[in-house]
Structures are given as structure tokens and as C-alpha cells.
Amino acid sequence: MEKNWFFPPHDGIRLGDLADQIGAELLDATAADRAVRAVAPVYRAKAGDVCYMLSRKSREELQTCSATAIICDKAISSLVPDTIPVLLTAKPHTAFALAGTLLHERAMRPSYNTSERGVSPGAFVDSTARLEAGVEVEPMAVIGAGAEIGSGTRIAAGAMIGPGVRIGRDCTISAGVSILCALIGNNVIIHPGTRIGQDGFGYAPGPTGGMIKIVQVGRVIIQDHVEIGANTTIDRGTMDDTVIGEGTKIDNLVQIGHNVRIGRYCGIVSQVGIAGSAQIGDGVMIGGGVGVNGHTSIGSGAQIAAMSGVASDVPAGERYGGIPARPMRDFLRDVAEMALRSSERQKKKGGKDE
């Protein structure tokens, strides 16, 4: 990659210091004073870069690697050339993530859109809104009546913070975000285009046909350290609250319906749709493109495979997949059986489709 001015390299961290901070062991102590400035993939890592390996599949990439260090576990360390220092750890993925936060702090949150600091004269801040010292508001942002925003929070260009919304400290609200009827904790990151707190989808049959809108008078509660991807939508509750638990990470293009409650430290990948009043426990992982039926429950620690359809409750700690979602062992057995039947059918037809 040619020079990347969006994310310039760090001024330099001693390799020995980096090892200490990411919880890794530097196998070659003589390399401790070398400077690390950036992260890079194995195949093009050069002096000043640190990279990581999780699999032997990357061993061919070592032929073009001249990194200052490679983060890996004991099983992979024997593949690394003697010329490249090893940062040994049982959790290389985690260690690399920590290295990234140290070397590229600027990339950990959406970047500033202007060079201005403070409240831009091009923003509209209602006279009854309360902003603590250190809040930054970029041009064309709107802060509604009675809104409260904590110190260190940045409201990016074109964002709309509705009346009475409360946002905690050290949050990043990116460009084009709209937030209504919501209480947001500290250290929350919301990426561009996300919509929070709009009406949930609820209608009843009309007395003479058509549909009558069901009133939506709940809120959205987003706890501390949540990160929400671009163009995700989170509806407010009907009468209760929609809740996103502490530390949960939500990808781009996720739809979360009214009254949904998501626990702490969950991971939800893009294009997931969670229908109203579903209950998600703590530490749940949901793969891309999953649909979750309304009023269902997914227990803590459960994992849902990508493209699955959750039609009924999932017990805690289970791995489910398929449509309808079922225990992974059953899903894989069903897939194998269907493949076998398809193969047998083709043989009966002489390999010709009809």
C-alpha cells in the first residue's frame, strides 16, 4: 500500500514496551529497543510494522515479510524466520487488537470532519440544552430542547440529537446520526447514518379495514462502551424500553425492533434483523444475515450461525444454525443428508438435470 495519510504511523513504541503492554513474551530480548510504528498484514509487513499469524495457511506470506515482529502462539512460532522477532502469546488475535489500539489510536473512533473544536457557529444548539465543558459540535448538527450531553463527547456534522435525549461522556456520535427518545451511557461510539429511537413497527387491524398504528411511547437505553455500526436502526419500545447492554458491539445494517433487550458483551454481525420483544442474553454471538423472531429468547453464551432463522427459543450456551435454527449438530446432519439424497437423485437420472 502506498503512503496512507488517513492513518499515519505512530512515532514509535519500543518493541519491549509493546510486548509488556499486550501481554506477550518477546523471545529475542536483543530486539527490545527496535521501534514499532504500525500494523500490517504478513505479506507486506516491513521494518517498523508488527503483524500476526493465526494459521499455518499464512506461511507462504512469510517469504515477503520483513516485519519488526510477528505476534503468534507457540504452534506457529516455529514457522517464523529467525530474522523476525516473535511476540509469543496464547491469544494472538487479542494481542494484535491491543497493539492496534496503541499504534493507531486515531483509527479507534470515527475521525473529525473539520479542524474546528468546541461548538461550531454553524450548529444549532437549543437554548435549553445542557452541554458540559469539552463537548464538541460540528457544523449542521442539531441539539434539541432539553438535551444533555456529557464532557468529551463529539457530535459530528449533520447529526440530530432530539429533545430530552441524554448522552454520557466521551461518546462519538458520527455524521448524519439521528437520536430520539434515548438515554446513552459513556464511551459509546455510533457510526454514520445510524437511526436510534424512532417508532417501532406496530399496527392493529382497523375496525372497518386497514390498520391502526400502535402508539410507541418507550425509550432506547444504550449502556456504556457500546459500539453501533453505520446505518443500523434501533426502534424505541412500545411501552417498555429497548435496551442494548454494556460492551455490546453491533455491526452495520442491523435492525433492532421495539422492546428488544440485548445483554452485555454481545456481538451482532451485519444484516441481522431482531424482531420486537426478543430477549438476547449476555455474551451472545449472532452471525451475519440472521433473522430472530419476535418474543423469542436466546440464552447467554449462545452462538447463532450466519444466515440462520431463529423461530423459537435457544438455550444458553448452545450453537444453533439453519432455517429454522436448530442445534448445530442436527443442522449439519440435515445438510449432509440432503447432499447425499441430491447425489443419489443425480445418479438415478444419469447425471442429467430435468
Curated annotation (Swiss-Prot):
Domain of life: Bacteria
PANTHER family linked to this entry: UDP-3-O-ACYLGLUCOSAMINE N-ACYLTRANSFERASE (PTHR43378), UDP-3-O-ACYLGLUCOSAMINE N-ACYLTRANSFERASE 1, MITOCHONDRIAL-RELATED (PTHR43378:SF2)
InterPro entries from the UniProt entry: Hexapep, LpxD, Trimer_LpxA-like_sf, UDP_GlcNAc_AcTrfase_non-rep
Cited Gene3D superfamilies: Hexapeptide repeat proteins, MurE/MurF, N-terminal domain
Gene name tied to this protein: lpxD
HAMAP family for the chain: LpxD (MF_00523)
Source species of the chain: Sinorhizobium medicae (strain WSM419) (Ensifer medicae)
GO MF entry, a single one: N-acyltransferase activity
Top EC group: transferase
Protein name: UDP-3-O-acylglucosamine N-acyltransferase
One Gene Ontology CC term in the entry: membrane
